[in-house]
Amino acid sequence: MPVPHRRLLCTALTLSALLALTGCASAASETTPDAERATQTGPLGDDDGYIPEGSSLPLDSGKPAVQRLDPALLGALREAQASAADRGTEITIADGWRSERYQETLFAQAVQQYGSEEEASRWVKRGADSAHVAGDAVDIATADAMDFLNRFGAEWGICQTYANEMWHFELLTEPGGECPAPAADGRG
C-alpha cells in the first residue's frame, strides 16, 4: 500500500475511534442521577439498610434498617411486639429503612422483572418516593406477624398500606383509630 493511502487509512481509523469514544462519553453523561446512585460501586450493605433475602431483623437490632426507622414507627412496632409476644408471635422485619441507592436498585430490578416502569411501580417505588427511604415503612417477615398487625395493628396506628403487599406496613392512623383501606398497589 502506498504511503499516502496508509496515512489516509490511519487518519480515518483514528477519527473513527475518537468519534466512538466521544459518543460513549456523551451517552454516559446522559444517565440520570438516580441511575448513577443505583449503580455506585460496591455491593449493598448495612449502611444501605440491606437485609439479605430470607433473613430478618428483630426490632431491637442495631442495624441501620431498624435504627433509621422513624422513631414513632419503631416505637409503635416495639409496643405491638410486646403484645404479639404474649400471643406467641414475634414481629421481625424483612425490610425497613433503605438508602435511596438501595431503593433505586430495587426499582431497576422490578423494571427488569415486570418489563416496564409502569408495571414495576405497582410493586416498588422510585428512590425518594418510597416510604422506606424516609424510614416510614417496614416489610414484616412472617405471615403470623402480618396477620397479627392486620388484626390488631390499628391499636398502635400500624396499618397495611397496599392490598397487593400484605407485608408492607406504615403508621396511617392515630393509635386506637381505624386503618384506612389499603391502596390497590404502589401507584396509589
Regions found by a protein language model. Give the residues of each.
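Secretory targeting and sorting signals
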Residues: 2-29
